[in-house]
Amino acid sequence: MDGAPVAEFRPTMTHGGRYLLYDIFGNKFEVTNKYQPPIMPIGRGAYGIVCSVMNFETREMVAIKKIANAFNNDMDAKRTLREIKLLRHLDHENIIGIRDVIPPPIPQAFNDVYIATELMDTDLHHIIRSNQELSEEHCQYFLYQILRGLKYIHSANVIHRDLKPSNLLLNANCDLKICDFGLARPSSESDMMTEYVVTRWYRAPELLLNSTDYSAAIDVWSVGCIFMELINRQPLFPGRDHMHQMRLITEVIGTPTDDELGFIRNEDARKYMRHLPQYPRRTFASMFPRVQPAALDLIERMLTFNPLQRITVEEALDHPYLERLHDIADEPICLEPFSFDFEQKALNEDQMKQLIFNEAIEMNPNIRY
């Protein structure tokens, strides 16, 4: 896909020249006419396709994600709206910036949603899988930026819930930006996520135990897993299923004591944990002898079984391992908590369309119909 000749994708003008329609390998890709060729497909997922293209008004290259048939499934539509609203609210160097929600040519008659964000070069998943050399300084700098972005997210009263290497985007200067907020939740909410959940390998023990009152600490666990994967170039806990995942965790950090199980209110979950084989705690120093002790100390504090005892993002930024990079004056917080109120109402397809259309119009006040 990456090597496709640029000349292949010539647009057709539509809607009186206000829009350009590209055919990307049989996929219809229709955007406002400020997005001029050359256009390049750079990725695809279950939702649709992503292309890089230049906005000729701002002279900035952007990544445009097409979410095809965005309203076929209520949950997916809500996820799209949540992502748009969150990205518009969160303004931070380590969070991907939203540039546009492209207004549809005909206000009520649209099924696809196009979201433009900053264009990045790659993601952490690709870097980990590549044979590119990564010094410990690189890993440390990536960890610092993840925590810096997460401090801002958590201060907005938001839990990301789906941190994993492929959701951490990078450019050639090693700048890191967190993306994919479709699963984010308010940090005060206590009902168990009913839909998708964090990719299993990065999932905190309390989520594996179906704890209903999880907190921002679940993101910290994910960061610990990601950092060790960066250093080791392979996943720390690559579980095949829920039970295998928990076994891998306890084999490393030890079977939790009754004291460590204190946060679990569900008696069945406690019983389940008590019946697991008894594993002693292994020291990270014995498993990763080449990693400096300060790094391992921080990771052990992140990978603490009990979320109430797990280190917070602010505490992690203040840890001696990050002393070289830490600067509290340059680690901003979000001054206004994000409101998830729009999720409280049951919305039908037309209402959901209207809300996403409203977001597009707010970002394109000069559009005329």
Swiss-Prot record:
ATP binds at I42, G43, R44, G45, A46, Y47, G48, I49, V50, K65. Interacts with MKK1. Interacts with CPK18. This is Mitogen-activated protein kinase 5. A motif (TXY) lies at residues 194-196. SMART domains: S_TKc. Expressed in roots, stems and panicles, and at lower levels in leaves. The TXY motif contains the threonine and tyrosine residues whose phosphorylation activates the MAP kinases. Involved in disease resistance and abiotic stress tolerance signaling pathways. Acts as a positive regulator of drought, salt and cold tolerance. Negatively modulates pathogenesis-related (PR) gene expression and broad-spectrum disease resistance. Functions downstream of CPK18 in a signaling pathway that represses defense gene expression and negatively regulates resistance to rice blast fungus. Phosphorylated by CPK18 at Thr-14 and Thr-32 and activated independently of MAP kinase kinase (MKK) phosphorylation. Keywords: ATP-binding, Cytoplasm, Kinase, Nucleotide-binding, Nucleus, Phosphoprotein, Plant defense, Serine/threonine-protein kinase, Transferase. Pfam families: Pkinase. InterPro entries: Kinase-like_dom_sf, MAP_kinase, MAP_kinase_CS, MAPK_JNK, Prot_kinase_dom, Protein_kinase_ATP_BS, Ser/Thr_kinase_AS. GO terms for biological process: defense response to bacterium; defense response to fungus; intracellular signal transduction; positive regulation of response to salt stress; response to cold; response to water deprivation. The gene is MPK5. GO terms for molecular function: ATP binding; MAP kinase activity; protein serine kinase activity; protein serine/threonine kinase activity. Dually phosphorylated at Thr-194 and Tyr-196, which activates the enzyme. Autophosphorylated. Phosphorylated by CPK18 at Thr-14 and Thr-32, which activates the enzyme. Belongs to the protein kinase superfamily. CMGC Ser/Thr protein kinase family. MAP kinase subfamily. Changing T32A: Loss of phosphorylation. The active site is at D162. It is found in: Nucleus; Cytoplasm. Induction: By benzothiadiazole (BTH), dichloroisonicotinic acid, probenazole, jasmonic acid, wounding and infection with P.syringae and M.grisea, by stresses, hormones, heavy metals, high/low temperature, UV-C and phosphatase inhibitors. It catalyses: L-seryl-[protein] + ATP = O-phospho-L-seryl-[protein] + ADP + H(+); L-threonyl-[protein] + ATP = O-phospho-L-threonyl-[protein] + ADP + H(+).
